[in-house]
């Protein structure tokens, strides 16, 4: 049976990882390993200064005292004797669109799976109330079945964003590019009980590039967005230009 490793960044007890694991377990052998707390915004960070501790929950999920990247690395390298066939990260409670992908622990967990040689996808539910996790799980299963039949390039993952709608109201699936947000709003300054200044990150910026063809545009218009992301960050098209620039300095 096909084995799928499921992880996330919202934490191993979050509703999204349960909805995803439950949906996948009807067709695949599922191994669910997630962080013991909410790690949203953890990106590709690793825990390097503390040991990782694990705890197996009553439902069989494994909780890890680390980041999403830690979870995937530990699961593949140590926790299971049989390597999974695929890594699926999510379902994230909220969008991973445009610039979000740089900070996303959900996307990072999928990236780590791909770094370790496995096909991987990240899936997120986009909306204000976040009630239709079953819709995101449905489309995750659909994409996974397609990947198992026809794999994508080995240096890519798929970043999937699903509108928070009933399944029958989703208009279809669009392959997209990343859009862009305006810069995040400023820091929020407040005081702790002792009167000392403390700071919170401001909310993310509004869409700057949500034109046709972007992930923002697809989801806003009721479509599932599937964006191929490359693990290799090299800007290959700039190498020749950069060499000319270097030669002149």
From Swiss-Prot:
<dbReference type="GO" id="GO:0008253">
    <property type="term" value="F:5'-nucleotidase activity"/>
</dbReference>
<dbReference type="InterPro" id="IPR030048">
    <property type="entry name" value="SurE"/>
</dbReference>
<feature type="binding site">
    <location>
        <position position="92"/>
    </location>
    <ligand>
        <name>a divalent metal cation</name>
    </ligand>
</feature>
<keyword id="KW-0547">Nucleotide-binding</keyword>
<comment type="function">
    <text>Nucleotidase that shows phosphatase activity on nucleoside 5'-monophosphates.</text>
</comment>
<keyword id="KW-0963">Cytoplasm</keyword>
<dbReference type="InterPro" id="IPR002828">
    <property type="entry name" value="SurE-like_Pase/nucleotidase"/>
</dbReference>
<comment type="similarity">
    <text>Belongs to the SurE nucleotidase family.</text>
</comment>
<keyword id="KW-0378">Hydrolase</keyword>
<dbReference type="GO" id="GO:0004309">
    <property type="term" value="F:exopolyphosphatase activity"/>
</dbReference>
<dbReference type="GO" id="GO:0000166">
    <property type="term" value="F:nucleotide binding"/>
</dbReference>
<feature type="binding site">
    <location>
        <position position="10"/>
    </location>
    <ligand>
        <name>a divalent metal cation</name>
    </ligand>
</feature>
<protein>
    <recommendedName>
        <fullName>5'-nucleotidase SurE</fullName>
        <ecNumber>3.1.3.5</ecNumber>
    </recommendedName>
</protein>
<feature type="binding site">
    <location>
        <position position="40"/>
    </location>
    <ligand>
        <name>a divalent metal cation</name>
    </ligand>
</feature>
<dbReference type="InterPro" id="IPR036523">
    <property type="entry name" value="SurE-like_sf"/>
</dbReference>
<dbReference type="Pfam" id="PF01975">
    <property type="entry name" value="SurE"/>
</dbReference>
<feature type="binding site">
    <location>
        <position position="9"/>
    </location>
    <ligand>
        <name>a divalent metal cation</name>
    </ligand>
</feature>
<dbReference type="GO" id="GO:0046872">
    <property type="term" value="F:metal ion binding"/>
</dbReference>
<keyword id="KW-0479">Metal-binding</keyword>
<dbReference type="GO" id="GO:0008254">
    <property type="term" value="F:3'-nucleotidase activity"/>
</dbReference>
<dbReference type="GO" id="GO:0005737">
    <property type="term" value="C:cytoplasm"/>
</dbReference>
């Amino acid at each position: 049976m096909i084995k799928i490793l499921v992880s996330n960044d919202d934490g191993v007890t979050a509703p999204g990882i349960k909805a995803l694991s439950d949906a996948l377990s009807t067709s695949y052998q599922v191994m669910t390993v997630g962080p013991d707390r909410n790690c949203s915004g953890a990106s590709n960070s690793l825990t390097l200064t503390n040991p990782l501790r694990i705890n197996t929950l009553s439902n069989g999920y494994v909780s890890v005292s680390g980041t999403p990247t830690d979870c995937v690395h530990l699961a593949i390298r140590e926790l299971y004797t049989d390597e999974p066939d695929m890594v699926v990260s999510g379902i994230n409670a909220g969008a991973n669109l445009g610039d979000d992908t740089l900070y996303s622990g959900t996307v990072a967990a999928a990236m780590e799976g791909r770094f370790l040689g496995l096909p991987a996808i990240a899936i997120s539910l986009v909306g204000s109330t976040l009630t239709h996790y079953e819709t995101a799980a449905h489309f995750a299963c659909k994409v996974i079945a397609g990947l198992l039949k026809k794999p994508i390039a080995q240096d890519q993952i798929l970043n999937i964003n699903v509108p928070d709608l009933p399944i029958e109201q989703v208009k279809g699936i669009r392959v997209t590019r990343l859009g862009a947000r305006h810069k995040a709003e400023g820091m929020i300054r407040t005081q702790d009980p002792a009167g000392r200044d403390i700071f919170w990150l401001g909310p993310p910026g509004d869409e700057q590039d949500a034109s046709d063809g972007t992930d923002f545009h697809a989801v806003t218009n009721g479509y599932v967005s599937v964006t191929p992301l490359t693990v290799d960050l090299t800007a290959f098209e700039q190498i020749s230009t950069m060499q000319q620039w270097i030669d002149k300095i």
